[in-house]
Amino acid sequence: MKELNRDMYVMVTDYVKPNTGKDVSDDLQKLILNNPNRTIFFPDGEYLLSKPICTPANPVNAVSLKLATFAKLKAMDTWTEKEALVRMGAAEPYNSIYIPGSNYYFEGGILDGNGKANGISIDSGRETAIHHVSIKNTEIGIHIKWGANNRSSDADVHSVNIVGNHSKTSIGVLLEGHDNTLTNMRIAGVHVGIQADSGGNIFRNLHPLYIYAGENAEDENFFTSVAFMDRGNDNFYDICYSDQFCTAFSMLSSSRNIYTNSYIMWYTTRSGVENAFKAHGSFNSIIRMPHVNFNAETTNALLTVTEKNGSGMIEYPMINHAEYITDQTYLEYLSGNVITPKT
């Protein structure tokens, strides 16, 4: 089995030792560039980085990075970069799905930003995958940058948990590239859970949780917190769950999104504002069967808009304590009944 593993993978510990307390950034970068079209495996242990490690997007030189469950890439205290620990496709930008090697991935392990670094970014390439990763103490957990194909990045992210650094600028996932799929994710310790500055994205079973800690412990910062901030258009949300953020879902007037089976709740009333959906401009999306649990008689809204006469629709909302709603704007866009539990 030992020899089989070395046939299947480039074993990092044959070249770079973990748990030394020393910077291994340059050694890992050299290992990546010297092993094109290989899967590079990181056994358990801590690997300290003073700067990002970058993989090529060119399919003939691309690599996949696979970490054991308890292998950890951690930013050193001396980290000064405004980038991620791992930058997929950054070493050699490329745009192709035709050349073998275009589909590469990052899988497993732990990325620890040490409160300074971002977790992982997709800088170039097509159809890059990130999965089964634990991302901790980051300013931005995952950053999908402008895609190589006319801004389309086509990334696939699933089974990832993210805990941010509790700053008022922290973001779980930032999407600038189009046409990505995010599924089965848990996010906490951030000010914004998911920020989509692009379109054509599919979001399913995502659960951002707001935690009162660090800069986010201040109520004045809570008021600008958003679980799902959409600044793009034509995005699809299915079974997405906002937990305690001041605003669960925000969108622009240009947004033509579909929200299905959203779940929204607040576990405390300490900050006094509960917004389920907020349109910056007119409301032009479709919301189907949202489940909303308002906590108490605070300033509550199922929908707020900054401009009237939108063409959006809210279908069959299920609301716990509908009597707590103080902004009745949603009635102008309501289709079907409001479903409330009998008391």
What are these regions (language model features)?
Residues 1-2, 78-88:
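Sequence/structural signature of small/polar-enriched beta-strand/turn repeats
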Residues 27, 31, 286, 302-304, ...:
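Charge-rich, solvent-exposed alpha-helical interaction surfaces
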Residues 40, 47-50, 72-75, 86-87, ...:
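Beta-strand-rich extracellular passenger or scaffold domains
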